[in-house]
């Protein structure tokens, strides 16, 4: 899962990712459990004061809606996977939260109210430069006031940050935030920029106390699939524009994987990118409303394909970093335009405009490698 074990004073002999007698091959892994079964089975590791947090979200959104603001639920940063109920050791997804923080800034500047589900300790809106300095040269910050965007104080009135650390906290908070944001209807965006763990240890399979480093000859773990909640988001907030992310290392499967997420989970758009240039290029994939559905010319995708998988019935918007300091500014602006284009009253006009485009542009899209 692109993860590392963060464990002081522990020896980890194997975190198996290859097939073995104890660990099934990836293709043989059991399907993720039903999301509601996951929530019902998690009692001790759910967020504290969840009901109070929901009330905060409801109150914040009600106030911003009285001001007729559009709203976005934005997730940012990585999630941890605890290995014990009384957690000492955990698996962590690497994510600085920079993309989420900087996209939050753009949504705020565009007049949106933002509910920010962020990893505690990750980058934060209007403070990314300060965090970078803190990591690179902390002594240089001593004796200096913290730099801040001139308009940040005013903009943050429209920001509600809620922190998480574990995969359990993230999924519970995501469900409540989606249900809360539904009050905004089509004026809502769900922007899923968090780096969410793919595998986890269920609560009922965890050690209750710290795993003793000398009790065994090393440590072997079998992880379960994290339930996929993308399909549930459209149940919790059916009128919101849902934007997810897809990162791959093989350019030949990227478009097919992005289109597959639209087909399988019903998301409205997928920000697709490749690992080697994700800071410089993102392609937003969405379904072409004038095409006769999305068609992917492939069966099972193995990840080792040497030729691009043809995909039809999608529209693409290529976002390049260009002269911007990061790609996140033009990326967020493109999502804002997409949301505006789908507003009531604009959808029909946009469809008529799209009808005038050449069919080859409407029916086929291939993100650059």
What are these regions (language model features)?
Residues 1-4:
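Low-complexity, disordered terminal segments
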Residues 9-19, 24-369:
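A cross-family phosphate/adenosyl-ligand binding-site feature
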């Amino acid at each position: 899962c692109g993860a590392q074990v963060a464990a002081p004073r522990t020896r980890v002999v194997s975190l198996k990712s290859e097939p073995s007698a104890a660990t099934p091959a990836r293709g043989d892994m059991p399907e993720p459990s039903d999301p509601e079964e996951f929530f019902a089975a998690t009692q001790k590791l759910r967020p504290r004061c969840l009901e109070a947090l929901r009330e905060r979200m409801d109150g914040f959104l009600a106030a911003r809606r009285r001001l007729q603001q559009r709203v976005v639920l934005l997730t940012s940063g990585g999630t941890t996977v605890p290995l014990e109920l009384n957690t000492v050791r955990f698996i962590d997804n690497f994510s600085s939260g920079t993309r989420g923080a900087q996209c939050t800034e753009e949504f705020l500047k565009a007049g949106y109210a933002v509910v920010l589900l962020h990893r505690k300790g990750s980058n934060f809106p209007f403070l990314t430069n300060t965090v970078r300095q803190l990591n690179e040269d902390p002594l240089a910050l001593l004796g200096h006031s913290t730099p801040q965007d001139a308009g940040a104080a005013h903009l943050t009135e429209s920001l509600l940050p809620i922190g998480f650390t574990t995969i359990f906290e993230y999924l519970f908070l995501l469900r409540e935030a989606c249900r809360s944001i539904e009050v905004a209807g089509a004026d809502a965006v769900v922007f899923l920029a968090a780096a969410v763990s793919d595998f986890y240890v269920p609560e009922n399979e965890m050690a209750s106390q710290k795993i003793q480093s000398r009790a065994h000859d090393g440590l072997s773990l079998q992880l379960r699939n994290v339930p996929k909640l993308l399909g549930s988001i459209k149940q919790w907030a059916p009128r919101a524009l849902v934007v997810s992310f897809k990162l791959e290392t093989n350019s030949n499967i990227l478009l097919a994987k992005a289109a597959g997420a639209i087909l399988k989970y019903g998301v409205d758009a997928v920000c697709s990118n490749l690992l080697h240039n994700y800071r410089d290029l993102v392609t937003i994939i969405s379904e072409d409303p004038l095409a006769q559905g999305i068609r992917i010319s492939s069966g099972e995708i193995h990840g080792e394909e040497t030729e691009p998988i043809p995909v039809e019935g999608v529209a693409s918007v290529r976002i390049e970093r260009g002269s911007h300091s990061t790609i996140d500014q033009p990326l967020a602006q493109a999502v804002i335009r997409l949301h505006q284009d789908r507003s009531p009253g604009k959808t029909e006009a946009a469809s008529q405009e799209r009808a005038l485009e050449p069919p080859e542009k409407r029916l086929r899209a291939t993100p650059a490698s």
